[in-house]
Amino acid sequence: MLKTLLFIGMGSFTGGVLRYLISRYVQNFLTPSFPLGTLLVNVLGCFAIGLFYGLFERGNLMNPNLRMFLTVGFCGGFTTFSTFMNENFQLIKDDNFFYLSLYVGLSLFVGFIMLYLGYSLVKQ
């Protein structure tokens, strides 16, 4: 268990640092008025987690610690949006459109409400 946690931690560190560097570079040098850096990181994270899970299903990358490093660690540190999208993709693959709609709707609606509540709490 400790070894797995270390792999996740190393992946999270790597993904988080890379997210910061990419996002900062894009925002500073390309377009400071639109959150293009975050959008780029989220889209790249979705591509990465799709690539990794595709390789897992083919039988490649079967080492459990490497899987944890890449998915929970790297992709989780890079962007949680990739995990969110992968979970939605799994619901689509399972033909579970009710839970897909519920998950997307609640994530966006409740997430925005909670952001607003948190902001309002300290803004007063």
Swiss-Prot record:
<keyword id="KW-0407">Ion channel</keyword>
<dbReference type="GO" id="GO:1903425">
    <property type="term" value="F:fluoride transmembrane transporter activity"/>
</dbReference>
<keyword id="KW-1003">Cell membrane</keyword>
<dbReference type="GO" id="GO:1903424">
    <property type="term" value="P:fluoride transmembrane transport"/>
</dbReference>
<dbReference type="Pfam" id="PF02537">
    <property type="entry name" value="CRCB"/>
</dbReference>
<feature type="transmembrane region" description="Helical">
    <location>
        <begin position="97"/>
        <end position="117"/>
    </location>
</feature>
<comment type="similarity">
    <text>Belongs to the fluoride channel Fluc/FEX (TC 1.A.43) family.</text>
</comment>
<protein>
    <recommendedName>
        <fullName>Fluoride-specific ion channel FluC</fullName>
    </recommendedName>
</protein>
<dbReference type="GO" id="GO:0140114">
    <property type="term" value="P:cellular detoxification of fluoride"/>
</dbReference>
<dbReference type="GO" id="GO:0046872">
    <property type="term" value="F:metal ion binding"/>
</dbReference>
<dbReference type="InterPro" id="IPR003691">
    <property type="entry name" value="FluC"/>
</dbReference>
<feature type="binding site">
    <location>
        <position position="76"/>
    </location>
    <ligand>
        <name>Na(+)</name>
    </ligand>
</feature>
<comment type="function">
    <text>Fluoride-specific ion channel. Important for reducing fluoride concentration in the cell, thus reducing its toxicity.</text>
</comment>
<keyword id="KW-0915">Sodium</keyword>
<keyword id="KW-0997">Cell inner membrane</keyword>
<feature type="transmembrane region" description="Helical">
    <location>
        <begin position="36"/>
        <end position="56"/>
    </location>
</feature>
<dbReference type="GO" id="GO:0005886">
    <property type="term" value="C:plasma membrane"/>
</dbReference>
<feature type="transmembrane region" description="Helical">
    <location>
        <begin position="69"/>
        <end position="89"/>
    </location>
</feature>
<keyword id="KW-0813">Transport</keyword>
<keyword id="KW-0812">Transmembrane</keyword>
<keyword id="KW-1133">Transmembrane helix</keyword>
<dbReference type="GO" id="GO:0062054">
    <property type="term" value="F:fluoride channel activity"/>
</dbReference>
<keyword id="KW-0472">Membrane</keyword>
<keyword id="KW-0479">Metal-binding</keyword>
<feature type="binding site">
    <location>
        <position position="79"/>
    </location>
    <ligand>
        <name>Na(+)</name>
    </ligand>
</feature>
<feature type="transmembrane region" description="Helical">
    <location>
        <begin position="2"/>
        <end position="22"/>
    </location>
</feature>
<keyword id="KW-0406">Ion transport</keyword>
